C-alpha cells in the first residue's frame, strides 16, 4: 500500500493498515512528519504552530481511544488551563470563557445580569453536552454501520436530542445577537479564537464540553512531538516512510490504481494507493480530473473557490522573548479597532488571537524566556497579489538532495506587507506588555503562502472543507454513501482532512475509517490495539486565575 502524505491522516492510515496486515510505504513531500501539525526552530526557540487544544487528549470518549491506538499521548503530560479562551473588548473589558459551566455561568452573570435568561440557557446546554460526548461515535464510520448499529447509535443520543437539535440549527451569530450586553454579543463569536460565521452553536458546545471534561488540553512536546510519536508508532509496526518524495501522478491501469510517479521520475508500484494529502491536488493533478462524479467535479472545480467553503489560511507571528512575562495570559482574542485592523493584510475579522505559547509548552524554549504566538484568519488572495506571480513552491537541490519546501523569493510588496503586519502587532503587544519589544530575540512571520509551500494545501487552507456549509456537507454525504473512494477507480482511497471536516482528531479518525473500508473490500476483519510501549498520559490542571496547579492520574 502506498500512502501519499505523512500528515496525521497519512500516519494514522499507515498505523491502522500495519495493524491489519498490510505492508505500507508513506511518501512525504516535506522532510518532517505532521503536515500542518508541525513546528520549527529559530535559535534557541521552537515555534509550535498547530495544537492550541487537542480533542480527545483525555478519557471518557471514543476520540481518546484513537490517540492511544496511535501512540500519540503515552508517556506525556496533558496540560489543561481552567479557561478555554479570553475575549478582550476594545474598551478593555474581558470575558473569561471558563469551560466549567457553573463557573462560566457565575462569571457571565456578573458581567451582564440583564442577560441572565440567555446565559443560563447556554450553560444548561453545555452541561448536557458534557454527558453527550461519551456517546459520540468516532471509532467506526456511519457508512459501515449495520442497521442495528445505527439504531443503537441513535438511541444513545435520545437523552440529548433537544440540545443537539437546538444547537445545530442555530447559528452562533444569531444566538449571540440576542445578548443585551454589547461585549457578550460580540465575544461569543470568538470563543473558538476566530469568528466562524457559518458555525452553529453545536461545535462551540463540543469544544467547551471536551475542555471541561479534561479532553481538550495540550500534549507535552507540542505539535511536532505528537506527529513524531505517531511516526514512531508507525515504524514500530513495521511501516516505511520516505521524505523529500513529491508525488506527481497516481498511476492507473485498466481503471485500477497501481502506484505513483514522483517528481524525479521514480515510480513506486502498489496494490492499493491512499491519498492523504491536498484534495484538489489529488483529484485534479494526480488523477487529471478523471474519476469524478457530478458531486466531486462540482466540489473541486467550482465549490472550492466559493467564499466560505474551505477554511482560510493563517497569518502567524512568533516572537521569542529573552525574559519571562509572568502576568501573561495563555490565550486571548483581542477585538481590534479599525485603524489596527487596516494594517493587517488579509484580515477577515477585526481580531487577533494572542497566545503566550511557553505557558502551553515550556519545554520548547529556554528557562526564563517566552514565546508569543499571534494569529489571525487570513484570505490568501491579497498575499498572492503582492507576490506578483512568483512561484509558490519549487524544487531545488540542497545539501546534495532535492528539497521541495525551501523558502522562495517573493515580491517586494509582499515583504513590505509582512513587515507592516509584524510591526503593527509588535506595537499592539508592547502597549499591553511593556518591555516586550525590547525583549525580542527572534521573530518569524508566516502567511497562507507559507502554508502552500510547506504542505501544498489549496489556497493555504489549514483544515480543508468547512463543516456546516455546502462543501463539507456534500463531501461527507458522498463518503457516507460510497466510502472514501472515487467512482470508477479501483484500489484507490482518500484519507486525511480532505476526506472529513474538522481538526486533528478528524484527520486521525479518517485514517482508522479508511482502513476499515479497505478491510471490508478485502474481506478482512478490522482490528486495532492500544500502544503499550509507554505508560498512560498524566494530566495537570493549570489555573490562569487564582488557584493551585492540580495533578491528576
Give the positions of each predicted feature.
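A short, glycine/Asx- and small/polar-enriched loop/turn
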Residues: 89-92, 196-201, 251-258
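A conserved FAD-binding loop/helix module that cradles the flavin
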Residues: 51, 497-519
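Active-site-proximal substrate-binding core of FAD-dependent oxidoreductases
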Residues: 246, 252, 520-553
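N-terminal glycine-rich phosphate/pyrophosphate-binding loop and immediately adjacent elements
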Residues: 1-134, 466
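A glycine-rich dinucleotide-binding beta-alpha-beta segment and adjacent secondary-structure elements
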Residues: 181-195, 426, 431, 435-501
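C-terminal segments that line or cap access tunnels to active or ligand-binding sites in enzymes
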Residues: 322-446
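Active-site/ligand-binding neighborhood in enzyme catalytic cores
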Residues: 127-237, 244, 457-472
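Mid-domain catalytic core of redox enzymes
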Residues: 215-218, 248-370
Amino acid at each position: 500500500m502506498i500512502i501519499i502524505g505523512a500528515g496525521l491522516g497519512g500516519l494514522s492510515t499507515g498505523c491502522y493498515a500495519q495493524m491489519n496486515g498490510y505492508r505500507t510505504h508513506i511518501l512525504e513531500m516535506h522532510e518532517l512528519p505532521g503536515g500542518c501539525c508541525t513546528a520549527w526552530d529559530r535559535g534557541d526557540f521552537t515555534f509550535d504552530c498547530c495544537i492550541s487544544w487537542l480533542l480527545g487528549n483525555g478519557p471518557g470518549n471514543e476520540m481518546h481511544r484513537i490517540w492511544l491506538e496511535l501512540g500519540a499521548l503515552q508517556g506525556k503530560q496533558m496540560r489543561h488551563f481552567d479557561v478555554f479562551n479570553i475575549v478582550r473588548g476594545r474598551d478593555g473589558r474581558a470575558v473569561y470563557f471558563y469551560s466549567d459551566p457553573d463557573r462560566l455561568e457565575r462569571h457571565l452573570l456578573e458581567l451582564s445580569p440583564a442577560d441572565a435568561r440567555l446565559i443560563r440557557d447556554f450553560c444548561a446546554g453545555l452541561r448536557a453536552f458534557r454527558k453527550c460526548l461519551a456517546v459520540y461515535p468516532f471509532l467506526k464510520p456511519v457508512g459501515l454501520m449495520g442497521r442495528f448499529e445505527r439504531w443503537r447509535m441513535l438511541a444513545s443520543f435520545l437523552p440529548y436530542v433537544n440540545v443537539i437539535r437546538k444547537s445545530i440549527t442555530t447559528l452562533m451569530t444569531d444566538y449571540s445577537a440576542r445578548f443585551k450586553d454589547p461585549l457578550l454579543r460580540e465575544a461569543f463569536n470568538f470563543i473558538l479564537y476566530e469568528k466562524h460565521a457559518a458555525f452553529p452553536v453545536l461545535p462551540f458546545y463540543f469544544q467547551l464540553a471536551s475542555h471541561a471534561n479534561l479532553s481538550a488540553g495540550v500534549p507535552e512536546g507540542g505539535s511536532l512531538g505528537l506527529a513524531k510519536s505517531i511516526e514512531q508508532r508507525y515504524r514500530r509496526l513495521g511501516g516505511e516512510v520516505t521524505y523529500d518524495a513529491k508525488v506527481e501522478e497516481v498511476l492507473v491501469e485498466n481503471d485500477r490504481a497501481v502506484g505513483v510517479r514522483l517528481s524525479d521520475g521514480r515510480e513506486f508500484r502498489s496494490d492499493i494507493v491512499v491519498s492523504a494529502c491536498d484534495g484538489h491536488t489529488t483529484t485534479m493533478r494526480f488523477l487529471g480530473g478523471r474519476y469524478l462524479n457530478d458531486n466531486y467535479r462540482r466540489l473541486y472545480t467550482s465549490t472550492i473557490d466559493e467564499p466560505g467553503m474551505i477554511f482560510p489560511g493563517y497569518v502567524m507571528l512568533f516572537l521569542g522573548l529573552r525574559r519571562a512575562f509572568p502576568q501573561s495570559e495563555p490565550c486571548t482574542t483581542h477585538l481590534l479597532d479599525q485603524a489596527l485592523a487596516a494594517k493587517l493584510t488579509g484580515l477577515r475579522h477585526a481580531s487577533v488571537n494572542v497566545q503566550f505559547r511557553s505557558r502551553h509548552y515550556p519545554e520548547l524554549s529556554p528557562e526564563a524566556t517566552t514565546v508569543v504566538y499571534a494569529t489571525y484568519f487570513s484570505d490568501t488572495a491579497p498575499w498572492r497579489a503582492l507576490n506578483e506571480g512568483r512561484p509558490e513552491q519549487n524544487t531545488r537541490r540542497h545539501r546534495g538532495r532535492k528539497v521541495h519546501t525551501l523558502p522562495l523569493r517573493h515580491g517586494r510588496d509582499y515583504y513590505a506587507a509582512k513587515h507592516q503586519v509584524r510591526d503593527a502587532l509588535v506595537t499592539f503587544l508592547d502597549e499591553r506588555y511593556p518591555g516586550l519589544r525590547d525583549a525580542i530575540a527572534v521573530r518569524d512571520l508566516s502567511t497562507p503562502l507559507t502554508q502552500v509551500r510547506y504542505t501544498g494545501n489549496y489556497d493555504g487552507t489549514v483544515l480543508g472543507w468547512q463543516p456546516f456549509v455546502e462543501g463539507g456537507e456534500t463531501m461527507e454525504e458522498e463518503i457516507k454513501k460510497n466510502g472514501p473512494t472515487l467512482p470508477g477507480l479501483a484500489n484507490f482511497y482518500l484519507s486525511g482532512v480532505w476526506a472529513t471536516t474538522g481538526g486533528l482528531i478528524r484527520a486521525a479518525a479518517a485514517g482508522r475509517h479508511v482502513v476499515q473500508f479497505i478491510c471490508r473490500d478485502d474481506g478482512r476483519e478490522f482490528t486495532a490495539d492500544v500502544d503499550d510501549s509507554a505508560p498512560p498520559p498524566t494530566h495537570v490542571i493549570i489555573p490562569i486565575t487564582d488557584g493551585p496547579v492540580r495533578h491528576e492520574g
